[in-house]
Regions:
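Membrane-interface coil-to-helix junctions
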Residues: 14-108, 130-153, 261-287, 332-340, ...
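Membrane-embedded helix bundles of polyisoprenyl
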Residues: 105-118, 123-171, 175-215, 225-244, ...
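Signature aromatic-anchored transmembrane alpha helix within multi-pass, membrane-resident enzymes
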Residues: 227-234, 368, 374-404
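Active-site-proximal, structured, solvent-exposed surfaces of multi-pass membrane proteins
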Residues: 328, 491-600
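Membrane-interface helix-loop junctions at the exits of transmembrane helices
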Residues: 18-26, 85-90, 94, 123-145, ...
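Membrane-interface helix-loop-helix junctions at transmembrane boundaries of multi-pass membrane enzymes
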Residues: 4, 174, 216-224, 303-339, ...
Length: 600
């Protein structure tokens, strides 16, 4: 019977996901709106740099006057991803749909596996999936273009492998070292795939769960295992993480976060059936409803309350308290000494806002506790369990229908922008102050970048790099670190020039990471400047370059020369070295364990 129930429940789950995302498959050649241009630009840049220029996507020359691409947390996120082959082989609109659908399915499988650690019931596992994987919040966030939210798909996987690695419940089998590696690998994927909020929140959740589990088990093993997962994730993600940290060191992202929500607003978040992008509700302080809504419906809310009250056990108590802490963070800055303002003072969390995002992982934890409470009830039912399972399958089918109906509301607007009719080019490159009129499409609150990348044109305006974002510029359009200039600007002197005024500089070969400049008639001791924002990763002829008014400058030692500027993040190779050492350590530990088993 359980096998049949498994099939039925997965049919319900897949039908729900299909219904929620069905609007994306109407016109399959459209793009998203709101924040989607930024995310589409990041993905298109990876494709163009690899396919057209045969380079690794280290630098983005097209936006803000140039900025690190691989060192951005939200950029370069398809390079180490299961979706890279699809982006390289498909059109951008088609690949976007593969990623969104794929991450929804990945989240569903992860939530199912996590629930399996707490219940044998297919229906209860399915309840965890349908209430978490593609609920109202997921739909609102993805529709708005917050593709970093997709990385939450790895959160249940991390918790699943971590729980197996700790092995606090002996009835579920002995702990395995490989699960420590797998948990670390999932955390590393969150780094590579742009989990700007999911990653620190998942690390925090694992830390909370580990501390509380150490208290309930009276053992340090959960803390040690959590630390091992963290160290492995650091090593496995080092090629991406180190450049990110280098960028954050130079351009710290510090934001205020004074958002609050009252109890009536919280009830609306979970139960109001008006959950579209333009919905308006009271009880919340700021931002659009896409930053608050998380519809799961009254049946799930009631089940969660009962589950939290009835949930008990070594792991369940630890998960419950971890979930309640995350939930309290979601209420924001309702008091100066509330959990969120205190956490927001700490490194990493200083760069985050919109604390309602904590409610999503809180929901997952409390759903797992509820699943355990339901399992205990089903065990007591003895011979009546089969009948109860049938009732639960019917109930979870209704929940899937209910949540799916509401999550369907925003996804109707997910991909509505027509693909720009812009010819893709690798022709001569130049920088404009603003996006040329002929490239403007579906203007949103931030400047568009996709069409500039397609036409091989750079812009000073941008929304792809937080440090240079138009939103943070002064009235003159300036922000620290922005040194490049666009055509028509009084300070624009070409894409390469000699500031001293003697001699000429001409770009003869151009690609995102490498620019060759031919210099004639210069005097020794002069300099050649590349019209891109300065970053320590730039070099010229194998030597470091200078920061000249926030642009890239190299020394000249002869009157005629070809100067090749190249960009690579300074911490990339050290990160690769750490990655290789980490892989070697994992391989060594695996071989040692095999030998030990063979000798036993």
């Amino acid at each position: 019977m359980l096998a049949v129930a498994d099939v039925v429940c997965w049919a319900v789950i897949l039908a729900m996901i299909g219904f929620v995302l069905a609007p994306t498959m109407g016109d399959r050649n459209t793009l998203g709106s709101h924040d989607w241009d930024q995310m589409e630009s990041h993905r298109y840049l990876v494709d163009k740099t690899i396919l057209a220029y045969h380079q690794f996507p280290f630098w983005n020359p097209y936006a803000c006057g140039g900025h690190p691409n691989w060192g951005g947390f939200e950029s370069g996120t398809t390079v180490v991803s299961p979706w890279l082959p699809f982006y390289l082989a498909m059109t951008l609109p088609h690949a976007l749909r593969v990623e969104v659908w794929g991450m929804a399915l990945l989240s569903a499988v992860g939530a199912w596996l996590l629930a399996s650690r707490f219940t044998k019931s297919p229906a209860v596992r399915a309840l965890v999936v349908v209430a978490f994987a593609v609920n109202g919040r997921w739909a609102l966030q993805i529709t708005s273009g917050h593709t970093w939210h997709l990385a939450y798909a790895w959160t249940p996987w991390v918790l699943y492998f971590y729980d197996r690695a700790v092995g606090a419940d002996a009835s579920l089998g002995p702990p395995r070292r490989r699960h420590v590696v797998l948990a670390g690998a999932c955390l590393a994927l969150m780094v590579y795939m742009g989990g700007i909020y999911p990653l620190p929140q998942t690390v925090f959740v694992v830390a909370l769960y580990g501390v509380f589990l150490s208290m309930t088990t009276r053992s340090l093993r959960p803390i040690v295992v959590g630390a091992a997962c963290g160290l492995l994730s650091l090593g496995l993600s080092a090629p991406k993480l180190f450049p990110i940290l280098e960028v954050l060191r130079k351009h710290p992202r510090l934001v205020d976060s004074t958002e609050t929500i009252d109890f009536s607003g919280f009830v609306d978040v979970l139960t109001s059936r008006e959950q579209d992008m333009s919905s308006g509700h009271g009880g919340v302080s700021q931002w659009g409803w896409h930053e608050w809504g998380m519809y799961v419906g009254w049946p799930v809310v009631v089940a969660l309350v009962l589950g939290v009250v009835a949930g008990r056990g070594t792991r369940e108590s630890a998960l419950k308290w971890a979930g309640l802490v995350c939930l309290s963070l979601g209420f924001g800055a309702f008091d100066p000494h509330a959990p969120w303002p205190l956490l927001h003072d700490l490194p990493v969390f200083q760069s985050q806002h919109v604390p309602s995002r904590w409610m999503y992982p809180a929901l997952l934890l409390l759903l797992a506790v509820t699943a355990s409470a339901a399992e205990r009830l089903l065990r007591r039912a003895a011979w009546a369990r089969g009948a109860l399972e049938l009732l639960l399958v019917a109930a979870v089918s209704y929940v899937a229908y209910d949540v799916g109906q509401i999550a369907h509301q925003p996804t109707r607007h997910m991909f509505t922008a027509k693909m720009p009719a812009v010819a893709e080019s690798t022709g001569p490159f130049h920088v404009e102050p603003h996006l040329p009129r002929e490239l403007v499409y579906e203007a949103e609150w931030a400047p568009s970048s996709l069409t500039a990348e397609m036409a091989n044109v750079g812009t000073i305006d941008c929304g792809t790099f937080p440090a240079f974002h138009n939103y943070f510029r002064d009235q003159q359009g300036h922000v620290p670190g922005l040194g490049a200039h666009g055509v028509g600007d009084k300070d624009y002197r070409g894409e390469a020039f000699i500031p001293e005024g003697v001699g000429t500089a001409t770009v003869t070969r151009w690609s995102p990471n490498e620019v060759a400049v031919e210099v004639h008639g210069a005097q020794p001791g002069e300099h050649v400047v590349l019209n891109q924002n300065y970053d320590p990763g730039w070099s010229a002829r194998g030597h470091e370059v200078d920061d000249w008014l926030d642009t890239v400058r190299a020394d000249l030692h002869e009157p005629d020369a070809t100067v090749v500027f190249r960009y690579r993040p300074p911490t990339f190779l050290p990160g690769v070295l750490v990655f290789v050492v980490t892989l070697g350590g994992i391989g060594w530990a695996y071989r040692r364990a095999r030998r030990a088993r063979a000798a036993a």
